[in-house]
Amino acid sequence: MQKQLLIESFLVNARYFTEIKTGVTESANLQNKNVQILRTIQGPMGIINEETANGRIYEEKEILNAIKALESKLKARACLGQLDHPKDEPSLTEVSHLVTELFIKEVNGKKYLYGTWEILNTPAGRILNNLYEAKIAIGTSLRGYGIVDENKKVKDYEL
């Protein structure tokens, strides 16, 4: 079987996000180049080991492998996000946040893929920041490639 593009959407109530840092700060990793981060938040981006709204199951071991494969991109600060659900790679003019960390977290007996986001001081980032401040639910969308087997389980997954 050939890998296919898999897109998962996950609507998250703002109360499930945790604020790590607030206020306009300069990113320490960018050698004082005045790149402004509006705030840093952590929150769930998808459910693990359970069927998603699209009828697929992402097992923990597959997600852990995908995170490991993405480590160099995360360290290079190259995992960009944007508002809405882009059809292609994020457009630099539409970037709202930078994903700096991905990990698995158990909440009330269920496992989730969590991410740490730096909300950027860009037009789209300011919109995302305002949505967060207003406690509006934030939808996340994961894009990856994998093979879906006959049991709806995703195999050989790449974020």
Q: Model features per residue range: what roles?
A:
Residues 1-75:
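Polar/acidic, low-complexity leader/linker segments enriched in S/T/G and N/D
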Residues 8, 100-159:
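Residue microenvironments linked to proteolytic maturation
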Residues 11-25, 30-32, 90-103, 148, ...:
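A structural signal for short, hydrophobic beta-strand segments that form beta-sheets
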Residues 29-37, 65-76, 105-109, 120, ...:
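Short, surface-exposed loop and linker segments with low hydrophobicity and enrichment for Pro/Ser/Thr
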Residues 32-34, 54-55, 90, 109, ...:
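Intrinsic-disorder/low-complexity loop/linker signature
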Residues 36-44, 79-81, 112-118, 154-156:
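Generic recognition of long tandem-repeat/solenoid scaffolds
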Residues 45-51, 83-87, 143-150:
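Short, flexible beta-strand-to-coil junctions
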Residues 75-91, 140:
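Short conserved beta-strand and strand-loop elements enriched in small hydrophobics
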